[in-house]
Amino acid sequence: MGALRAVFFDLDGTLVRYRGVDFESSWGAIAAAAGVSEASGKLLQEFLPKRSHYADWVRRDAELLAGISVSQVAEQIFPPPLADGVRDAIDQLRGRYLLGIVSSGVALVADRVCDELGLDFAIANHLQAEDGRFSGESVLRVDLWGKADVVRSVVTQRGLSLADVCYVGDHINDIPVMEIVGLSIAVHAKDPAVEAACDQVAPHFSDIPELIARHEEAVAFS
Protein backbone atom coordinates (compact mmCIF):
# COMPACT_ATOMS: atom_id res chain seq x y z
CA MET A 1 0.00 0.00 0.00
CA GLY A 2 1.44 3.39 -1.03
CA ALA A 3 0.61 6.99 -0.25
CA LEU A 4 -2.96 8.17 -0.60
CA ARG A 5 -3.86 9.94 -3.82
CA ALA A 6 -7.48 10.99 -3.25
CA VAL A 7 -9.80 12.15 -0.48
CA PHE A 8 -13.55 11.76 -1.01
CA PHE A 9 -16.15 13.35 1.26
CA ASP A 10 -19.74 12.75 2.14
CA LEU A 11 -21.76 15.98 1.94
CA ASP A 12 -24.73 16.07 4.31
CA GLY A 13 -23.69 16.17 7.95
CA THR A 14 -20.03 15.98 6.96
CA LEU A 15 -19.04 18.97 4.81
CA VAL A 16 -22.28 20.84 5.43
CA ARG A 17 -24.53 20.86 8.49
CA TYR A 18 -28.04 22.17 7.89
CA ARG A 19 -29.30 22.54 11.44
CA GLY A 20 -32.86 21.69 12.35
CA VAL A 21 -33.48 19.14 9.60
CA ASP A 22 -33.09 15.36 9.61
CA PHE A 23 -29.47 14.27 9.16
CA GLU A 24 -28.44 17.94 8.63
CA SER A 25 -29.18 17.20 4.99
CA SER A 26 -29.51 19.11 1.75
CA TRP A 27 -32.79 17.29 1.08
CA GLY A 28 -34.25 18.52 4.35
CA ALA A 29 -32.94 22.05 3.87
CA ILE A 30 -34.47 22.30 0.40
CA ALA A 31 -37.79 20.93 1.62
CA ALA A 32 -37.85 23.49 4.45
CA ALA A 33 -36.99 26.35 2.10
CA ALA A 34 -39.71 25.22 -0.32
CA GLY A 35 -42.34 24.95 2.41
CA VAL A 36 -42.89 21.22 1.99
CA SER A 37 -41.16 19.96 5.14
CA GLU A 38 -44.21 18.20 6.53
CA ALA A 39 -44.91 16.20 3.38
CA SER A 40 -41.21 15.49 2.87
CA GLY A 41 -40.85 14.33 6.47
CA LYS A 42 -43.71 11.88 6.06
CA LEU A 43 -42.07 10.45 2.96
CA LEU A 44 -38.78 10.11 4.81
CA GLN A 45 -40.40 8.15 7.63
CA GLU A 46 -42.18 5.94 5.11
CA PHE A 47 -39.15 5.12 2.99
CA LEU A 48 -36.21 5.24 5.42
CA PRO A 49 -36.69 1.61 6.57
CA LYS A 50 -36.97 0.45 2.94
CA ARG A 51 -33.34 0.36 1.88
CA SER A 52 -34.09 -0.94 -1.60
CA HIS A 53 -36.59 1.85 -2.33
CA TYR A 54 -34.34 4.92 -2.24
CA ALA A 55 -34.96 5.68 -5.90
CA ASP A 56 -38.69 5.79 -5.21
CA TRP A 57 -38.13 8.17 -2.30
CA VAL A 58 -36.00 10.50 -4.44
CA ARG A 59 -38.68 10.52 -7.14
CA ARG A 60 -41.50 11.21 -4.67
CA ASP A 61 -39.57 13.88 -2.76
CA ALA A 62 -38.60 15.66 -5.98
CA GLU A 63 -42.24 15.71 -7.08
CA LEU A 64 -43.09 17.80 -4.01
CA LEU A 65 -40.96 20.62 -5.42
CA ALA A 66 -42.72 20.91 -8.79
CA GLY A 67 -43.34 24.54 -9.71
CA ILE A 68 -41.31 26.05 -6.87
CA SER A 69 -38.76 28.74 -7.73
CA VAL A 70 -35.18 27.49 -7.65
CA SER A 71 -33.83 30.96 -6.87
CA GLN A 72 -36.14 31.43 -3.90
CA VAL A 73 -34.96 28.13 -2.45
CA ALA A 74 -31.33 28.98 -3.19
CA GLU A 75 -31.65 32.28 -1.33
CA GLN A 76 -32.55 30.37 1.82
CA ILE A 77 -30.07 27.49 1.65
CA PHE A 78 -27.00 29.40 0.43
CA PRO A 79 -24.32 30.08 1.34
CA PRO A 80 -24.07 26.45 2.43
CA PRO A 81 -23.39 26.04 6.17
CA LEU A 82 -19.95 24.48 5.99
CA ALA A 83 -18.93 22.55 9.08
CA ASP A 84 -16.40 24.24 11.33
CA GLY A 85 -12.88 23.56 10.14
CA VAL A 86 -13.80 22.52 6.60
CA ARG A 87 -12.15 25.42 4.80
CA ASP A 88 -8.93 25.07 6.77
CA ALA A 89 -8.75 21.33 6.18
CA ILE A 90 -9.46 21.60 2.46
CA ASP A 91 -6.87 24.36 2.08
CA GLN A 92 -4.27 21.97 3.48
CA LEU A 93 -5.32 19.10 1.22
CA ARG A 94 -5.95 20.94 -2.05
CA GLY A 95 -3.27 20.36 -4.67
CA ARG A 96 -1.94 17.29 -2.88
CA TYR A 97 -4.87 14.95 -3.49
CA LEU A 98 -7.79 14.47 -5.83
CA LEU A 99 -10.65 15.92 -3.79
CA GLY A 100 -14.30 15.11 -4.40
CA ILE A 101 -17.79 14.72 -3.02
CA VAL A 102 -19.74 11.47 -3.26
CA SER A 103 -23.19 12.13 -1.83
CA SER A 104 -26.71 10.78 -1.91
CA GLY A 105 -27.73 14.38 -1.24
CA VAL A 106 -28.66 17.04 -3.76
CA ALA A 107 -26.34 18.21 -6.54
CA LEU A 108 -27.64 21.78 -6.22
CA VAL A 109 -25.79 21.93 -2.89
CA ALA A 110 -22.94 19.54 -3.71
CA ASP A 111 -21.96 21.51 -6.82
CA ARG A 112 -22.02 24.80 -4.90
CA VAL A 113 -19.82 23.36 -2.14
CA CYS A 114 -17.48 21.88 -4.74
CA ASP A 115 -17.06 25.29 -6.38
CA GLU A 116 -16.66 27.19 -3.10
CA LEU A 117 -13.99 24.84 -1.79
CA GLY A 118 -12.18 24.31 -5.08
CA LEU A 119 -12.72 20.55 -5.13
CA ASP A 120 -12.16 18.46 -8.24
CA PHE A 121 -15.61 16.91 -8.61
CA ALA A 122 -18.98 16.31 -7.00
CA ILE A 123 -21.39 13.45 -7.63
CA ALA A 124 -24.88 13.74 -6.17
CA ASN A 125 -28.55 13.51 -7.15
CA HIS A 126 -30.10 16.04 -9.49
CA LEU A 127 -33.34 17.95 -9.11
CA GLN A 128 -34.38 18.98 -12.60
CA ALA A 129 -35.57 22.51 -13.36
CA GLU A 130 -37.29 24.30 -16.24
CA ASP A 131 -37.63 28.07 -16.64
CA GLY A 132 -36.20 28.67 -13.19
CA ARG A 133 -38.56 26.32 -11.37
CA PHE A 134 -38.20 22.77 -10.15
CA SER A 135 -39.91 20.45 -12.62
CA GLY A 136 -40.58 17.67 -10.14
CA GLU A 137 -38.25 15.38 -12.07
CA SER A 138 -35.03 13.96 -10.66
CA VAL A 139 -31.95 12.01 -11.71
CA LEU A 140 -30.61 9.45 -9.25
CA ARG A 141 -26.83 9.24 -9.39
CA VAL A 142 -25.99 8.05 -5.87
CA ASP A 143 -28.24 5.64 -4.02
CA LEU A 144 -28.24 6.10 -0.25
CA TRP A 145 -26.88 2.57 0.16
CA GLY A 146 -24.92 2.48 -3.10
CA LYS A 147 -22.03 4.83 -2.45
CA ALA A 148 -19.48 2.03 -2.60
CA ASP A 149 -20.44 1.31 -6.21
CA VAL A 150 -20.03 4.98 -7.11
CA VAL A 151 -16.64 5.15 -5.42
CA ARG A 152 -15.50 2.04 -7.29
CA SER A 153 -16.59 3.67 -10.55
CA VAL A 154 -14.75 6.92 -9.80
CA VAL A 155 -11.62 5.01 -8.83
CA THR A 156 -11.68 3.09 -12.11
CA GLN A 157 -12.30 6.21 -14.20
CA ARG A 158 -9.49 8.11 -12.49
CA GLY A 159 -6.93 5.32 -12.74
CA LEU A 160 -6.76 4.84 -8.98
CA SER A 161 -7.08 1.88 -6.66
CA LEU A 162 -9.35 1.75 -3.62
CA ALA A 163 -6.23 1.68 -1.45
CA ASP A 164 -5.35 5.13 -2.82
CA VAL A 165 -8.51 6.67 -1.35
CA CYS A 166 -9.35 8.26 1.98
CA TYR A 167 -13.09 8.57 2.63
CA VAL A 168 -14.67 10.90 5.21
CA GLY A 169 -18.26 10.37 6.36
CA ASP A 170 -20.67 10.59 9.26
CA HIS A 171 -23.47 8.03 8.99
CA ILE A 172 -24.18 4.32 8.63
CA ASN A 173 -24.72 4.55 4.87
CA ASP A 174 -21.05 5.55 4.64
CA ILE A 175 -19.87 2.30 6.23
CA PRO A 176 -19.80 0.25 2.98
CA VAL A 177 -17.34 2.78 1.55
CA MET A 178 -15.31 2.92 4.75
CA GLU A 179 -14.83 -0.83 4.55
CA ILE A 180 -13.19 -0.79 1.10
CA VAL A 181 -10.89 2.25 1.00
CA GLY A 182 -7.31 2.70 2.15
CA LEU A 183 -8.21 5.06 5.00
CA SER A 184 -11.63 5.83 6.45
CA ILE A 185 -12.32 8.73 8.80
CA ALA A 186 -15.50 9.47 10.74
CA VAL A 187 -16.40 13.04 11.64
CA HIS A 188 -19.63 14.26 13.29
CA ALA A 189 -20.56 10.56 13.58
CA LYS A 190 -24.31 10.01 13.91
CA ASP A 191 -24.11 6.39 15.06
CA PRO A 192 -21.61 4.39 17.15
CA ALA A 193 -21.41 1.87 14.32
CA VAL A 194 -19.72 4.49 12.14
CA GLU A 195 -16.92 5.04 14.63
CA ALA A 196 -16.57 1.28 15.04
CA ALA A 197 -16.27 0.74 11.28
CA CYS A 198 -13.79 3.47 10.43
CA ASP A 199 -10.01 3.56 10.79
CA GLN A 200 -9.86 6.95 12.50
CA VAL A 201 -12.25 9.34 14.24
CA ALA A 202 -11.68 13.07 13.77
CA PRO A 203 -12.70 15.05 16.87
CA HIS A 204 -12.86 18.12 14.62
CA PHE A 205 -12.85 18.52 10.85
CA SER A 206 -9.59 20.44 11.00
CA ASP A 207 -7.93 17.31 12.44
CA ILE A 208 -8.39 15.40 9.17
CA PRO A 209 -5.17 16.51 7.40
CA GLU A 210 -3.13 15.41 10.43
CA LEU A 211 -4.86 12.02 10.53
CA ILE A 212 -4.08 11.54 6.85
CA ALA A 213 -0.45 12.54 7.40
CA ARG A 214 -0.09 10.07 10.28
CA HIS A 215 -1.56 7.30 8.15
CA GLU A 216 0.85 8.00 5.31
CA GLU A 217 3.79 8.11 7.71
CA ALA A 218 2.78 4.77 9.19
CA VAL A 219 2.43 3.25 5.73
CA ALA A 220 5.83 4.59 4.66
CA PHE A 221 7.55 2.93 7.60
CA SER A 222 5.59 -0.32 7.56
Annotate each predicted stretch with a short phrase.
Residues 1-49:
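Active-site neighborhood of HAD-like aspartate-dependent phosphohydrolases
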Residues 53-87:
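Metal-dependent phosphoesterase signature
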Residues 21, 36, 67, 127-129:
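Short connector loops/turns at beta-strand edges and beta->alpha or beta->beta junctions
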Residues 2, 83-222:
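C-terminal cap/substrate-recognition subdomain and adjoining C-terminal extension
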Residues 19-22, 65, 78, 143:
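Catalytic cores of large soluble enzymes that bind and process phosphate-bearing ligands
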